[in-house]
Amino acid sequence: MTERTEAIPESTPEVASNSARSTLCYPYPAPPAPGSTLEIAPGVRWLRMPLPWALDHINVWLVDDAEGCAVVDTGARTEAATAVWRATFPQGGEAHTAFRVTRVLVTHMHPDHVGMAGWLTRAFDCRLWMTRTEYFNCRVAAADTGREAPADALDFYRRAGWSESAIDVYRARFGRFGQHIHALPESFRRLQDG
């Protein structure tokens, strides 16, 4: 005698997404409110920075050090991000703001991570810490701001099989990187392995 079993329905992305989401366990019931921080470990504070895109926020970190606190990642160059930084470090604000910002560390050159780095380093008279590759790639991308997409790049993408509509999107977005970042400082402290 064989036992009869029901067929397992095929998994769809929606089913997979919902089941994965229902099994996630978050250590905090809610993110910090704009301009507020949440201490997630001794000396490590979580700050949520708004973004004007589909991904509507980035997590940035304030890490206490011997002389104040280091900022890890910065948010994109927007009025909302500037307002959050001003609310986070007001004159005579919360107890942790008595520390000065000692450095700004940027993990990589995407505008949501590096966008406010130049503003923060000037506002707090501190150094930017970044890898050499990311720093110089950021400077190169910013230098293209306002330029049209190069013909050789358009030819490359056509040869790679891009449709004309995809080329049009690339052309429309090219040269906008610098709009999302404050100018980087002329020097930086190099982060490297080891």
Segments from the language model and where they lie:
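Active-site HxH/HxHxD metal-binding segment of metal-dependent hydrolases
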Residues: 80-83, 87-193
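Glycine-centered flexibility sites
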Residues: 43, 75, 115-116, 194
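Conserved beta-strand hairpin/beta-sheet module of binuclear metal-dependent hydrolase folds
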Residues: 34-96, 126
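A short, structure-level motif marking secondary-structure boundaries and short turns
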Residues: 20-21, 71, 101-103
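Accessory terminal helices/loops
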Residues: 1-36, 142-168, 176-177
